[in-house]
Amino acid sequence: MSTIDILSPSGDNAGTVELPAEIFDVEKISIPLLHQVVVAQLAAARQGTHKVKRRGEVRGGGKKPYRQKGTGRARQGSTRAPQFAGGGVVHGPTPRDYSQRTPKKMKAAALRHALTDRARNARIHVITGVIEGETPSTKAAKSFLGKVSERKNVLLVIERSDEAALLSARNLPQVHILEPGQLNTYDVLVSDDVVFTQAAFESFVSGAPQSSAADTEGSEA
């Protein structure tokens, strides 16, 4: 179990917090598990509403364009056949559901593996708050988060009730904000650093699923 410092908006050290080993230090990081869960998550985000009209769905074309024989041309039954301009589309996309079935235990294990990777590279941070006081300030939030991490993309985890932090950081283009219950594998991996407020960290740790057999499978990163 490793220990990290808790930083205050003023830049001072406000104490330390322990990162539970069952969440932030699993024995082996499974790359195939992370890949499978991220692919499933991105697939589930697809709308799948793409649609084209086939020849039977395109308006018009009910009349035979010319007689069957005697013209010297190939026989045609409708101007909405796919070989005509304005005709239907053959083998085009239809609405579908791209979501994949992913067991809850697999999602939870993948999140622990992603957090372990960030923790081992010193990219997990805990702060007392995003700003000092209750008055929202995007300028103050940007300055403080820039001191916490110099990397580009930051995942900020705050409590739902922390309105001052939300209003202060939501307009920062490189900061993505989530609540503890929304934390997921993709957002952890796509961000350079994960920054928890102290309240959000305690909430996440108390409600996070514990390690299981899935954490012992896969290759070590």
Swiss-Prot record:
Oligomer status and interactors: Part of the 50S ribosomal subunit.
GO biological process: translation
Keyword rRNA-binding: yes
HAMAP family listed in its UniProt record: Ribosomal_uL4_B
Signal peptide: none
GO molecular function, one term: rRNA binding
Gene3D superfamilies found in the cross-reference section: 3.40.1370.10
Protein name, per record: Large ribosomal subunit protein uL4
Family: Belongs to the universal ribosomal protein uL4 family.
Gene Ontology CC annotation, any one: ribosome
Region spans: Disordered: 44-102
Keywords annotated in UniProt: Ribonucleoprotein, Ribosomal protein, RNA-binding, rRNA-binding
Biased composition, class Basic residues, residue ranges: 61-72
UniProt cross-references to InterPro entries, sorted A to Z: Ribosomal_uL4 (IPR002136), Ribosomal_uL4-like (IPR013005), Ribosomal_uL4_dom_sf (IPR023574)
Lineage: Bacteria, Bacillati, Actinomycetota, Actinomycetes, Kitasatosporales
Function: One of the primary rRNA binding proteins, this protein initially binds near the 5'-end of the 23S rRNA. It is important during the early stages of 50S assembly. It makes multiple contacts with different domains of the 23S rRNA in the assembled 50S subunit and ribosome. Forms part of the polypeptide exit tunnel.
PANTHER family linked: 50S RIBOSOMAL PROTEIN L4, LARGE RIBOSOMAL SUBUNIT PROTEIN UL4M
Cited Pfam families: Ribosomal_L4
